[in-house]
């Protein structure tokens, strides 16, 4: 997958490059060169996957070839292993309303859903590059 800058489509980068940069050198945002369109049969095959397998399937579209699907699955599984529930997120019905519980991560915040995976991706991508990274996250 290649990514380009919103300010200059001639600037394009790999997943590894955008992950370590954050913003494009021209100050633009990174946009994927393509977004996979799932067929109805593909969507149907996704509906019974665990949250971890679904996350792996979707994220893999954006990080290939820099990170293969098997390695990604290990990183995603590791990220969600320390959640309080094996489902990672739970849906709870209260009367006629369905609530999505996003607080089962290690800090009890919805941000755990993304940040646990992102932390593992930084570890994996920077181990190969021998870089150190500090991630600063603010609470909502």
Language model region names:
Residues 1-140:
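PLP-dependent amino-acid enzyme catalytic core
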């Amino acid at each position: 997958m290649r990514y380009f800058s919103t300010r200059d489509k001639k600037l394009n980068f790999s997943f590894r490059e955008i992950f370590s940069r954050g913003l494009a050198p021209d100050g633009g945002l990174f946009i994927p060169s393509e977004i996979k369109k799932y067929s109805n049969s593909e969507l149907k095959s996704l509906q019974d996957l665990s949250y971890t397998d679904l996350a792996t399937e979707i994220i893999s579209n954006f990080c290939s070839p820099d990170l293969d699907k098997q390695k990604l699955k290990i990183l995603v599984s590791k990220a969600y292993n320390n959640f309080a529930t094996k489902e990672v997120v739970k849906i709870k019905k209260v009367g006629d309303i369905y609530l999505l519980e996003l607080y089962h991560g290690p800090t009890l915040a919805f941000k755990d859903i993304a940040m646990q995976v992102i932390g593992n991706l930084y570890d994996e991508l920077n181990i190969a590059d021998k870089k150190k990274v500090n991630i600063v996250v603010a609470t909502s």
